[in-house]
């Protein structure tokens, strides 16, 4: 299981390392502030092997880009990156568009048109606008156009969503669509098995020759020819109308020039000459692939033709690799095979469609093999440097993303970033910390057209209208078929301080209470803070709520649920700095709200958010919106049924016993006994039912062992249960009478090797045997 350091502290990796070396105990205390109630810091010594799948040499990539710049051989997408783009496209030939079904609108069709026609296309895809389906249709269209296609993203989740759609059948046969899913070593292990299976597929059922297959392809494309012509005219008319509106606005502002006088009548004439066609009519002209037997037959036969090439002797080396039984060896050999340009070209001849992350694209040859089309999804989350890996390998680029959603996660010190900008005279356009690849290229490239996907199909109207007003300036067109949707706000005033920062106990308790009372199932709980998510999940588990989980926003990007609960995590103890950070990341609210299909519930401390002066606050606006468009609710406290701080029982004791055994194993005069009844330790208490969690004995000078330490681990019940409190007092008195140290520790210290080691060493140095100060 992987855990990010940033989930527990705001220190960078380098700062944490330096702090750990210089102040071990102080650094542990910083970590303790970040762990949840049921987590523990483990300082027991361990040996482990740290290994990366591969080393990425960005300097080599940038050197190659610089060489291309000097030789004036940059590919079109890189020219656009440097602001040297032009309006040139892929000629006057109209692109051929293939749509899987009729779930498409004109904006989506224009996106596909631009991707196949232009060298570079920028797409803003707000939430719920059918972005994934449109990319899927673009892939189908590019496949019918016989293009090699690279689909890349910053992480795996968007890729998985697209790959899931590539499942077709023809005449009761599954179509073995020729694509590969690359990525980390585990993905490669799976992919090589897929290739092994592909070697076993025969072409016997494909009764079409190469020429017959080409005739069938052209037949399929001809069915959508009329629709493509109508779409072309629609776009020309729309551009002319927009330009005319712009000129008229300039005129109203008092501008007078010969250019305006000359251009206005030309635009008016152009608009009159282009036949008007409605968006509905354009879409109705398209023949959907899933209803077209010819199209499905082409997909089936063409896929078989691609895979049949594997039987050529040219692929013998690849065949030997995929037959290797050891998964890791097989994957490593395949990666080595893939790094050779000639091998990559062979592979693309069989599998013209490749899915990979931006970083893993570095394995695709040495960068001199170019894909016909690169589709980069979630480009608003992709950092500049790693995005250039796939961009440098493409002839054409479709860049899809949304700058109003999540930004790249970049671990670079701000001061270092500013120093680098000054040293190398880097403009704000290429500011590594402040930009994604999408924002940089749109700022640098003033020529290329932008496409906005405007039609929203996911959220209830009341829900998405907030995003539409606050983030998209009412440009979104909400589908009339959507439900109204419900929004509500639940004020969670909090005066309970938890030992962990960025937690609101009352809010967490109310969220769980709401889930139980309303029997919530198809739901996600979203919070900006890892610690609040941990607290909510702890309470959900304790209260038997298994269907719902809490997570931060990055975990739910791209997902959708009937109900979304937003837990802001803000309380009266939240620092102004944290709230300022929260307000500066409005994209969290945009993404969180737009995950909800039917119901949005916002929990928060309205008073705290309202009274903290940090400028414009999307969270205050969201609360106001929910109150004006929906309901306001207060959930009564249910402290009797929701408790935190319970002891973990045997789990904690197991962890402590393992830790303490390591310590006493290197101190031969010590031994440890677990769960020792008091009646066995002291004969004068034969009827006592009490026991110590652990007792440490020390060997005397003349032999024999004498008890010196007794350990007890305390959960919340040790401070709230009257019987437990009385029992603890009796244990303390017994220990005092017999000269034994009774050490009470919170559960979180059960795995803290260094703390317990120093505690025992401190005892041996303490001749007076006075009680040690633990906190």
Residue ranges of predicted features:
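Conserved helicase/translocase motor-coupling segment
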Residues: 475-539
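Nucleic-acid endo/exonuclease domains
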Residues: 624-775
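Helicase C-terminal subdomain and adjacent C-terminal extension
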Residues: 413-451, 487, 540, 576-666
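Conserved P-loop NTPase motor core of helicases/translocases
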Residues: 85, 91-96, 157-367, 408-428, ...
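Pre-P-loop entry segment of helicase/translocase ATPase cores
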Residues: 1-117, 188-213, 317-321, 326-334
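A short beta-strand element within the Helicase C-terminal
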Residues: 370-375, 559-571, 600-602
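Conserved motor-coupling elements within RecA-like helicase/translocase cores
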Residues: 343-348, 550-564, 571-574
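ASCE P-loop NTPase helicase motor core
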Residues: 11, 88-201, 332-472
């Amino acid at each position: 299981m992987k855990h990010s350091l940033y989930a527990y502290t705001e220190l960078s990796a380098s700062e944490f390392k330096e702090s750990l070396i210089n102040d071990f105990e102080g650094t542990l205390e910083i970590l303790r502030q970040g762990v949840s109630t049921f987590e523990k810091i483990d300082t027991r010594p361990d040996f482990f092997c740290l290994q990366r799948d591969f080393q990425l040499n960005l300097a080599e990539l940038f050197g190659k880009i610089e060489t291309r710049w000097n030789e004036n051989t940059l590919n079109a997408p890189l020219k656009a990156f440097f602001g040297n783009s032009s309006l040139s496209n892929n000629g006057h030939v109209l692109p051929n568009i293939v749509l899987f079904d009729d779930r498409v609108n004109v904006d989506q069709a224009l996106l596909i048109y631009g991707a196949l026609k232009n060298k570079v296309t920028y797409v803003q895809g707000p939430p719920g606008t059918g972005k994934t389906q449109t990319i899927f249709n673009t892939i189908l269209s590019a496949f019918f156009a016989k293009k090699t296609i690279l689909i890349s993203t910053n992480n795996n989740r968007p890729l998985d969503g697209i790959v899931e759609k590539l499942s077709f059948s023809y005449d009761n046969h599954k179509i073995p669509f020729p694509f590969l899913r690359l990525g980390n070593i585990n993905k490669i292990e799976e992919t090589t098995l897929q290739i092994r299976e592909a070697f076993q597929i025969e072409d016997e059922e494909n009764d079409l020759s190469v020429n017959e297959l080409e005739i069938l392809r052209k037949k399929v494309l001809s069915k959508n020819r009329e629709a493509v012509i109508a779409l072309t005219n629609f776009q020309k008319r729309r551009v002319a109308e927009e330009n005319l509106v712009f000129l008229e606005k300039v005129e109203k502002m008092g501008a007078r020039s010969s250019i305006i006088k000359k251009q206005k009548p030309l635009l008016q004439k152009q608009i009159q000459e282009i036949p008007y066609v409605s968006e509905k009519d354009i879409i109705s002209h398209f023949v959907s692939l899933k209803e077209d037997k010819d199209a499905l037959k082409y997909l089936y036969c063409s896929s078989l033709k691609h895979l049949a090439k594997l039987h050529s002797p040219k692929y013998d080396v690849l065949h030997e690799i995929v037959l290797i039984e050891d998964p890791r060896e097989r994957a490593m050999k395949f990666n080595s095979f893939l790094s050779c340009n000639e091998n990559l070209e062979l592979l693309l001849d069989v599998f013209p469609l490749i899915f990979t992350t931006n970083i893993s694209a570095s394995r695709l040859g040495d960068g001199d093999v170019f894909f016909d089309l690169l589709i980069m999804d979630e480009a608003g989350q992709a950092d500049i440097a790693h995005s250039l890996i796939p961009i440098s390998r493409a002839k054409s680029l479709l860049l899809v993303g949304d700058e109003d959603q999540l930004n790249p996660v970049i671990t670079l010190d701000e001061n270092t970033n500013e120093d680098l900008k000054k040293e190398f005279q880097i403009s704000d356009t290429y500011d590594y910390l402040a930009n994604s690849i999408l924002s940089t290229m749109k700022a640098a490239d003033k020529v290329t057209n932008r496409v906005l996907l405007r039609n929203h199909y996911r959220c209830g109207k009341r829900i998405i209208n907030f995003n539409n007003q606050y983030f998209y300036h009412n440009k979104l067109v909400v589908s009339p078929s959507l439900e109204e949707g419900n929004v509500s706000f639940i004020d969670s005033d909090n005066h309970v301080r938890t030992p962990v920062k960025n937690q609101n106990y009352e809010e967490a308790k109310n969220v769980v209470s709401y889930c139980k009372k309303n029997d919530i199932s198809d739901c996600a709980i979203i919070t900006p803070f890892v610690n609040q998510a941990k607290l909510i999940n702890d309470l959900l588990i304790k209260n038997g709520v298994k269907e719902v989980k809490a997570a931060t926003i990055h975990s739910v990007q791209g997902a959708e649920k009937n109900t979304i609960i937003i837990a802001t995590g803000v309380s009266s103890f939240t620092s102004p700095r944290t709230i300022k950070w929260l307000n500066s990341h409005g994209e969290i609210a945009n993404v969180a709200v737009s995950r909800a299909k039917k119901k949005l519930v916002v929990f928060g401390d309205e008073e705290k958010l309202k009274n903290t002066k940090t400028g414009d606050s999307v969270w205050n606006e969201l609360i106001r919106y929910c109150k004006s468009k929906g309901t306001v609710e207060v959930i009564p406290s249910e402290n009797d049924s929701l408790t935190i701080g319970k002891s973990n029982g045997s789990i904690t004791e197991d962890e402590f016993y393992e830790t303490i055994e390591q310590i006493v194993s290197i101190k031969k005069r010590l031994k440890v006994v677990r769960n020792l009844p008091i009646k066995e330790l002291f004969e004068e208490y034969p009827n006592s039912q009490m026991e110590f969690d652990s007792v440490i004995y020390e060997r005397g000078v003349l032999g024999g062992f004498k008890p010196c330490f007794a350990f007890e681990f305390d959960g919340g019940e040790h401070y709230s249960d009257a019987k437990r409190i009385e029992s603890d007092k009796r244990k303390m008195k017994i220990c005092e009478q017999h000269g034994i140290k009774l050490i009470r520790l919170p559960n979180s210290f059960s795995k803290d090797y260094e703390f317990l080691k120093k505690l025992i060493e401190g005892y041996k140095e303490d001749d007076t045997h006075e009680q040690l100060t633990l906190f």
